[in-house]
């Protein structure tokens, strides 16, 4: 299956991404209000278009979301899911920061926003942020962290196994 690519910044072109490897490309580079923070009007447009693409089966399950400035697209895509789910996120950031100014969706807040918005998300495990970032993050029910330090010292693997086992996703 070939990936569906969201082209928002031009990163694929600058990195020499082979477009022939992509299944479909949605060129959104001209869309305003998307760099790091998502304008509410643009968010409504994207939600409607993503819903349409899902209904018409134009949205395969493998998706490339551009650079880290557009991680908030994950929150919009999670909004399309109706079944219960558990999300594993590999990132060096918690992506659970409250917005600095206005209550807008951002690349740094999308996990926090998704955890609070969708009842079908039964758990989120964020794997990779530094311990200092996790300490600064407001705790939320059903959100777990495996820090970079835990990965480095080897204790992270056991913690990941515990998290998955507590959700009955694997049997120990």
Predicted regions and their residues:
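N-terminal glycine-rich anion-binding loop in soluble enzyme alpha/beta folds
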Residues: 1-42
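Short, charged/polar "capping" segments at the starts of alpha-helices
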Residues: 12-16, 132-137
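Active-site histidine-anchored catalytic micro-motif
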Residues: 63-131
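Conserved small/polar residues in nucleotide/adenosyl-binding loops
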Residues: 170-172
